Amino acid sequence: MIKVVLIEDSKTLAGALKAALEIEGIAVVWASDGVQGVAAAKREKPDLILLDLMLPKLSGFEVCKLLKTDNATWRVPVVIMSTLVDEESRLRATEAGADYFIAKPYDLAASMAEIKKYLKM
């Protein structure tokens, strides 16, 4: 089964995205802060990581950099989903190792299409 780690501090957004992914047959592990997210990604060995940038404990930039420099997770694609859409934030995310960027608020159908591309569905 395809597995995604969703690192998002908004329970509402996480719930909506989790439900949409699960309808597609994708297992979702949700983490609500950066520390939990890093631990979940290492433990679960997901096919994809969906990552917010504005998180408690560790920022999404820090999480991405940690995951992309860890032998257990460096190959896992990281898709940023954030309201921080300015050029500097996008550049920082890319420098941290992010593979793709989806701006919030996002269109769920369009976002699911992009996510499916990374999952090769």
What do the predicted segments below correspond to?
Residues 8:
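Conserved acidic carboxylate
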Residues 11-29, 118:
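Two-component/phosphorelay signaling modules centered on CheY-like receiver
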Residues 18, 106-116:
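C-terminal output helix
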